[in-house]
């Protein structure tokens, strides 16, 4: 669930997926979004022979997006710094966590605000194909994503409007 741009790092995820499909032939990567890199990413899917593993959705309802998240095991967005663009707070990771979906995020940007490494997901070096691959493989192996997803769900509960309002009130009373 993200825009298709260089910062989101779909290319490296696809390269890791190419290797993972040898071990896990039923693996599927669901892409929800649009953006300037969409055609390049679709072309890379063909080049890497991943058409059977990658599904694309865009302009879908919130209900369908939420249903796809709920059926997912892992949310992966190992963002990188691209030019001067850095990932902000990882709201997409929190959305996934609400459905007990563990996440893999990049060490650059806001993923670490939403993911507790080795507790609710994994933080990896998005510039390293090996790190992305090993993070995915580690979660898939022995279905580790189930435990991390359960923890992610618990963490996501603190990111609701009531808690956010209370945090703002605390800040404002200090001013």
Regions found by a protein language model. Give the residues of each.
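A structural motif in glycosyltransferase catalytic domains
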Residues: 13-16, 29, 132, 168
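A short, well-ordered alpha-helix in the C-terminal region of glycosyltransferases
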Residues: 26, 131, 144-158, 167-170
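Short hydrophobic beta-strand element within catalytic cores of glycosyltransferases
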Residues: 93, 98, 102-105, 115
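Nucleotide-sugar-dependent
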Residues: 80-94, 112-113
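Nucleotide-activated donor-binding/catalytic signature segment of Leloir-type glycosyltransferases, i.e.
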Residues: 42-64, 74
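Acidic donor-binding loop of glycosyltransferase active sites
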Residues: 70-85, 101
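Conserved acidic donor-binding segment of nucleotide-sugar-dependent glycosyltransferases
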Residues: 117-118, 122-129, 138-143
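A conserved mid-protein helix/loop that constitutes part of the nucleotide-sugar donor-binding site
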Residues: 3-22, 36-43, 130
